[in-house]
């Protein structure tokens, strides 16, 4: 059986924590920020944890 490979696009966007949760950075922060409120930009800096239904999908494509 061939070796399982990680989905490289997902590997760059999602990180698995030690407890098995999946973290990611939210979108809408990289450019065109001048019209956005400071509170919104500050909130977009934080890592977010995916919901359980999405975590299952991400774990399947990130076996390592």
Curated annotation (Swiss-Prot):
Entry keywords, A to Z: Ribonucleoprotein, Ribosomal protein
Pfam families in UniProt: Ribosomal_L35p
GO BP: any one term: translation
Region (Disordered): 18-39
Start-end of Basic residues biased regions: 26-39
PANTHER family membership: 54S RIBOSOMAL PROTEIN BL35M, LARGE RIBOSOMAL SUBUNIT PROTEIN BL35M
Family to which this protein belongs: Belongs to the bacterial ribosomal protein bL35 family.
Protein's UniProt name: Large ribosomal subunit protein bL35
Taxonomic path: Bacteria, Bacillati, Bacillota, Clostridia, Eubacteriales
């Amino acid at each position: 059986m061939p070796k399982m490979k990680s989905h490289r696009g997902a590997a760059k966007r999602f990180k698995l924590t030690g407890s098995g949760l999946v973290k990611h950075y939210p979108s809408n922060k990289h450019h065109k920020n001048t019209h956005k409120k400071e509170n919104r930009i500050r909130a977009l800096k934080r890592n977010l944890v995916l919901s359980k239904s999405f975590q299952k999908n991400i774990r399947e494509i990130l076996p390592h």
